[in-house]
Amino acid sequence: MSNEGYDVTVFESMPKAGGWLRYGIPEYRLPKDILDKEIELMCRNGMQVETNKKLGVDFTLSQLSEDYDAVCLAVGASQAVEMNYSGSDLDGCYLGVDYLKDYVTEQNYVTAKKLP
């Protein structure tokens, strides 16, 4: 849209822009420097990115409607859905979405050594 002359502001809830391209795809599959260059190109064309901004926490849909001529919500799949199966409650068993995000950000999850 910014290529067509529209002012575009993207509100990203995470510390860096990119959504699941950044937080859900491991570095070896999608190098983050390539993603950063793509985002930088979009910003050069006029797109603005505001990070650490959560809908319903930092702003409301009503506020967006008042402040902007048009609003497009592209809410990602940031919450994992639990699947109750035998063993899913064991220590070291993580939901995939949570594990991928943690791997890229905090790296708090403990993983076991490789089994023989």
Question: What kind of feature is each model-predicted range?
Answer:
Residues 1-116:
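Residues forming the flavin
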